[in-house]
Amino acid sequence: MTQQKPPAGADLSQTFIRFALDAGVLSFGEFVTKAGRKSPYFFNAGLFNQGAMLGEVAQFYAKTLLASGVQFDVLFGPAYKGITLASATAVALAGMGRDVGFAYNRKEAKDHGEGGTLVGAKLQGKVVIVDDVISAGTSVRESVNMIRAAGAEPAAVLIALDRMEKSGTAEQVGTHSAVQDVQREYGIPVIAIASLKDLLAYLDASQDPALSASREAVAAYRQRYGV
């Protein structure tokens, strides 16, 4: 895959969706979520597993963060996917003239060497949490607690895709999404490169019959579980 810098502005989310489709990170079919719901699409950020691909996705993260206007001093990547995403985003930001530190946590505390659960830059000032998606919000909750315990302030959560999906199971559907719960509980914005709304807009505009055929199933899923 040839690495290209993503555009700025309103086209960013649509370009990201095309990029995710080309990379196989976003796919359509019938998938079962952790909540037991049958989803017509699947987003697997673990497939951003090539150097050029990771460099490109980092550009999307960096451009989205800068465009948000959120003030920040450090990036924090929760283990495990967030580690790579935060470090790659820091590299992309440096290339744009915004050089900041990044840190991440270990799942298990280390009792030798530097010790503890935190690795990397000191958590200070305003910290942006970088991850792939927000499912139940557990990772964000743990990250916020670590950031505050270090004396820093959580400033925002930066993710690739907002599924805009109510919490709960296939039968018991909640009233809010995990993203909305995070924003309400911690009073910080959740910034997404793209959302389910953007995905539907992409499918509406697509000239690809295979993609257009998925539009009805995605729209029905949003009707049932979306916010």
From Swiss-Prot:
EC number of this enzyme: 2.4.2.10
Catalytic activity from the UniProt record: orotidine 5'-phosphate + diphosphate = orotate + 5-phospho-alpha-D-ribose 1-diphosphate
Binding sites annotated in the UniProt record for orotate: 42-43, 135, 163
Enzyme class, broadest EC rank: transferase
InterPro entries: OPRT, Or_phspho_trans_dom, PRibTrfase_dom, PRTase-like
Gene Ontology CC terms: cytoplasm
Needed co-factor(s): Mg(2+)
Gene Ontology BP annotations: 'de novo' pyrimidine nucleobase biosynthetic process; 'de novo' UMP biosynthetic process; pyrimidine ribonucleoside biosynthetic process
Pfam families from the UniProt entry: Pribosyltran
Keyword check for Hydrolase: no
GO MF, one example: magnesium ion binding
Pathway(s) where this gene product acts: Pyrimidine metabolism; UMP biosynthesis via de novo pathway; UMP from orotate: step 1/2
UniProt superkingdom: Bacteria
Keywords per UniProt: Glycosyltransferase, Magnesium, Pyrimidine biosynthesis, Transferase
Positions that bind 5-phospho-alpha-D-ribose 1-diphosphate: 34, 80-81, 106-107, 110, 112, 131-139
PROSITE patterns, sorted: PUR_PYR_PR_TRANSFER
Summary of subunit composition and partner proteins: Homodimer.
Similarity field: Belongs to the purine/pyrimidine phosphoribosyltransferase family. PyrE subfamily.
NCBIfam families tied to this protein: pyrE (TIGR00336)
Record function comment: Catalyzes the transfer of a ribosyl phosphate group from 5-phosphoribose 1-diphosphate to orotate, leading to the formation of orotidine monophosphate (OMP).
Name of the molecule in the record: Orotate phosphoribosyltransferase
Gene name of this polypeptide: pyrE
